[in-house]
Amino acid sequence: IDFHFPIITNSTVAFFEKEGVGYAWETNFVQLAVPFRVEDIVEFAKENEFENLIAVDATASDELISHYNTLIQNGFNIVAVNKKANTLPIGLYKEIRENLKKYDKEFLYETSVDTGFPVLQTLRDLYNSGEKITKIRGVFSDNLSYVFNRFSSDETAFSAVLKDASLLGFMRSTFRED
C-alpha cells in the first residue's frame, strides 16, 4: 500500500504539500506550515483531485469532530482514535451516521484501555463470531486503576494518592478523556 500524506495538521497550522517539495514532512511542517481552516483542506484536496481521502483524527479534542460532516460530505473517510467521537450529542451523532451512508464513506475508530488493549474491535469480533456478550465489568483506566488500588490498600489520603499519580505521569487533565 502506498500511503501519501499531502496535508498534515496540528490544531493550529497545516502543511500543504506542493510540487517540488521533498518528503521530509517533519522539516517541511516546521518550515512551511500555515494557519488553516477545514475548508482549506477540502479545497486543497479538490484542487489536486486526490482520491481515497482519509482524515485521521488523533486528537482528544471536540474541534475536529465538529467538522466530520464537512469532511464526509467532501469525500473524506474518517479514522479516529478520538474517544469523544462516539459520545456526541445524539443529533450530531445521527447526522454523521446519515452522511456516512449518504456519501458511502466509512468511520473507523478504536480505543484502548489500560496498557493498550484494543476494546472495540475485540468486542466486535466476539459479537460477529456469535458470542453473546451479557456484561462487561472492570476499571478500564490505568489512571483510575492506580488511584483506586492505591487508595483501597493504603492508609493514604486521597489527595496524596492523586498527587502521587500525577508525579508518576498517570494523570490526564480530566478523567473523562481516559
Residue ranges of model-derived segments:
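Rossmann-fold NAD(P)-binding glycine/threonine-rich loop
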Residues: S61-N74, K83-L126
